[in-house]
C-alpha cells in the first residue's frame, strides 16, 4: 500500500498551525481579560516600585472599560465599566491619565469620590482627619540619594511606605507639594499620589482627578526587576552580546516576586 506522505505532511502542518493559533488566542484572552504585565519607566512610586520593575496586574479587579482592553483601547467600544468592582484606598492602580491617553501611569489610590483631601506639612488629611504617619527609617537609592521613609495608615487600615527626599546640609531640596490646596474629589473620579512624594506627577499637580473609566488594572506583584535595560540604544547582535553580561549582573534578585502590598520589612 502506498502512503501519500505529502498529504500527511499537509495535515500535520495544518494541525500545528491550529494548535499555535489556539495558544495565541488563549494568551491574548489572558492579557485582555485576566492579567497583564507592565514595565515601570519612572521613579514616582520609589521605593515601592523602582524604574525597570516589571509588574503583574489583574485586569478583572475593577471590571472592564474601553481603556482596560489591551489592543482595543483605541476603539470606542463602549462607555463606562462592565462587571465593575469598587477600588479601595491604598490600591496601586495602572490607569490612563485623562490629560494624555497615550501613556499609562501607576500610582496609589488615596481619595475616593466625595472625599476632601489636603496635604499639610506632608501629612495627608482625608475628610479633615489626618492619617497616621510614622517615620521608620531611611532609604538610599541606587543613585545615592537619601530618602526619609514613613509608614502611613489609611482610614481603611491599609498600610504602606512613602518616601521623602532627605534634607542636604539641613536644606530641604524640594518641598513644593507638601502643602496643598483642598481637593474635593468629584463623583466617579479618584485622587492619586505617588509614594515618592517629592518626585511624582500626581493628583496634586498636573494629573488631576482620574475617572474610574480610565482604570486599567490593579498592580499586584513584581515578577522581574533590573537596574538597566539592554534595548535602550541601538539594537543589533553585537550590541546585545556586549550588553548581556552587565544586564544579567544588574538583575535585582531581591525584588523578584515581591508582593506590592507587603509592609513586613
Swiss-Prot record:
PROSITE patterns: SPASE_I_2 (PS00760), SPASE_I_3 (PS00761). Its EC number is 3.4.21.89. SUPFAM superfamilies: LexA/Signal peptidase. One of its GO terms (biological process) is signal peptide processing. Gene3D superfamilies: Umud Fragment, subunit A. Pfam families: Peptidase_S26. It catalyses: Cleavage of hydrophobic, N-terminal signal or leader sequences from secreted and periplasmic proteins. It is found in: Cell inner membrane. InterPro entries: LexA/Signal_pep-like_sf (IPR036286), Pept_S26A_signal_pept_1 (IPR000223), Pept_S26A_signal_pept_1_CS (IPR019758), Pept_S26A_signal_pept_1_Lys-AS (IPR019757), Peptidase_S26 (IPR019533). One of its GO terms (cellular component) is plasma membrane. The active site is at residues 44, 107. GO terms for molecular function: serine-type endopeptidase activity. This is Signal peptidase I. It comes from Rickettsia canadensis (strain McKiel). The gene is lepB.
Amino acid at each position: 500500500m502506498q502512503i501519500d506522505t505529502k498529504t500527511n505532511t499537509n495535515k500535520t502542518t495544518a494541525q500545528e498551525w491550529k494548535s499555535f493559533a489556539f495558544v495565541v488566542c488563549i494568551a491574548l484572552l489572558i492579557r485582555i481579560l485576566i492579567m497583564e504585565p507592565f514595565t515601570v519607566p519612572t521613579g514616582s512610586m520609589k521605593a515601592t516600585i523602582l524604574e525597570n520593575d516589571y509588574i503583574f496586574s489583574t485586569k478583572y479587579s475593577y471590571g472592564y472599560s474601553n481603556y482596560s482592553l489591551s489592543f482595543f483601547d483605541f476603539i470606542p467600544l463602549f462607555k463606562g465599566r462592565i462587571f465593575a468592582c469598587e477600588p479601595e484606598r491604598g490600591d496601586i492602580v495602572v490607569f490612563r491619565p485623562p490629560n494624555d491617553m497615550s501613556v499609562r501611569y501607576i500610582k496609589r489610590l488615596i481619595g475616593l469620590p466625595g472625599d476632601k483631601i489636603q496635604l499639610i506639612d506632608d501629612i495627608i488629611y482625608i475628610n479633615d482627619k489626618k492619617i497616621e504617619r510614622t517615620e521608620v527609617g531611611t532609604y538610599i537609592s541606587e543613585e545615592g540619594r537619601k530618602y526619609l521613609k514613613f509608614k502611613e495608615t489609611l482610614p481603611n487600615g491599609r498600610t504602606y511606605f512613602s518616601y521623602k527626599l532627605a534634607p542636604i546640609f539641613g536644606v530641604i531640596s524640594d518641598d513644593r507639594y507638601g502643602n496643598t490646596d483642598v481637593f474635593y474629589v468629584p463623583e466617579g473620579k479618584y485622587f492619586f499620589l505617588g509614594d515618592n512624594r517629592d518626585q511624582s506627577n500626581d493628583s496634586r499637580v498636573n494629573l488631576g482627578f482620574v475617572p474610574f473609566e480610565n482604570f486599567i488594572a490593579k498592580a499586584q506583584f513584581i515578577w522581574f526587576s533590573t537596574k538597566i535595560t539592554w534595548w535602550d540604544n541601538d539594537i543589533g547582535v553585537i550590541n546585545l552580546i556586549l550588553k548581556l553580561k552587565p544586564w544579567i549582573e544588574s538583575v535585582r534578585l531581591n525584588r523578584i516576586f515581591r508582593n506590592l502590598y507587603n509592609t513586613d520589612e
